[in-house]
């Protein structure tokens, strides 16, 4: 006997407790015949019908000795046509004391299949597996279905459909393999299900081991990785699209990504060796991201083209956007950004050469810089920032490109600065009347807003030390693209330019931004008096501003970032002084971090602007005291201006002389051909001081200070500062995201293994049109979440190209066998909702499914 008397009693009572009123116990060997009468079933009854089926039938049906009844019969089963109790047997619940019968009863397996379970005894040693088999929604009505359900239980699958169950089993095998484990495969083998596993994998994935060899998870993983990049790898019979579907699921799931990454790296060489050398280009690889070496190929291809001068900036940026949502992008992001920014910087410099000669006035040069030339500075900043983060190997390979960009940018700065200095005094004084001036900022941008602007709401001003124009323009572009969120309110931003005072150093710039008044520079301390009052420090500036605007509040931005905004309900004006760029740039030890400081400044200023808007400011205006010059390479000897006698004068007693890297001031200055000298009056200042600036981008020698980051001189990078206006806007004025439309390349039917469409970006991106993230996939028309292709494709529509052809992206989706369950499928493009992770349908096309014919010819 498999079980003792007490266990039999407990099992029978358990069946009754589950609501089974009649149990039919078929005991063919008769091994329990002697103990049947001794069973204690309480208020239930047991009827032994052995040899007396017909007479017992009356007892069972008419007299029924108890509400809960066990019908016991020993000996061979009669044929159905000879069985007097066949109808009773069909109506009753089968009961058995054989282990396979017990397992069948416990796990919801039909009794006719109980014999199958005896082949897999180890499976039932686990309560967890028995529970999973009992709870599974998978069919268990035949031997194959039953074994597949057991296989799914071994892998912990909760799938409802057989194909999904096989996918789950394969995923579990690959996860184990990627983590150096083999638990699932060992369990499958111990349970006697290995013979079931590989035929099911063949059916769903299409994988079979080479002739004469046994299938293994290792071979399966390699074949699946090759299948995921079948457009590149032409190696043997292709697998089904489900292979790519399984890998895509592993890669996308944060809990299994580590396993996918481990497998992709382990088999990367084996996959890549199957790709012809001629197809290792950015065009051939496309969006394929099965293994990381594909990104290495693209980066190498782009770098080679950049060094040859054959990489268009638009192509580099398009490639970055194409790879933006691929699996390994984060590992290569800085390399893509460096190549795109480097190409854009070089291209922008070439464009400058073609237009600069046409600008022959101070205003013309200023306007050209404000409108276009400033982009070179931004691309150079992005290039240097990306190169700083790039891995050492890429830095070595890109050394020649770095030299090209540094050389070209240095020449650009020299030429542009020479032109600016040549026309600096065209109007006789600086700043000229036809260029917006920092000295007029408070009147034009603050006082004119009151008392009625924005229905009396307060105004916010953020002064970010050394935020040059290109950084402010970047800030405005990011906010316009949605970087600043105020709940459901839309926030817009635009950037204007104005000329700062000369010399372009902190004390003078900060004074110029205060209410109007004559300014005088103390030639010894470099502090500035305005209207006779001191302007250095927050307390002195508070006095000056409050005299013009009672109730105004001035703050240090660092306090706002740490503690939040204090109560400002009664303040008509809130001014916050921010210092991230100049703080790091002005130190010799940290000047190399200045571009990283620019990124910090953008995020910090945006955060402070949000605080001010939430506090009731109708507008927030961001500006700066001055800009800066920065070159990442060490300053060479010829870039220093040697001025005889300047250092001696600066240290001589009784001489009011001081100087920085880019300016000198005093009542008397040494005469030198390498200095441009102006009087206070020429620079719109009071006093008898003289001010001199090195020609071009040369620096004055100054002990103890850095030389790569400088300001104070006369260059557009130092002299043009932003005026960024940030405010809530209605939907008509807010920047809109570009649109998207799909174009199917063939007939609206699925007859093969792929579906191809062109994803069209309807408008080029600009300051008024922002990029859009879309997702492309094939779905069940009755279940929008059910995917019918190997994977969804995520695209970043960010092209600025005017040509509609350049704004098209071709997408090929590989159809899984799930599509054969449907009469139709829906091809859908969904757009990201704001900055969330949600997507809404934007474009759809219904496709009929007719693969019975097409598959015969789909190679």
List PLM regions with ranges.
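…; additionally, a secondary subgroup of soluble metalloenzymes is captured
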Residues: 1-459, 466-620, 624-859
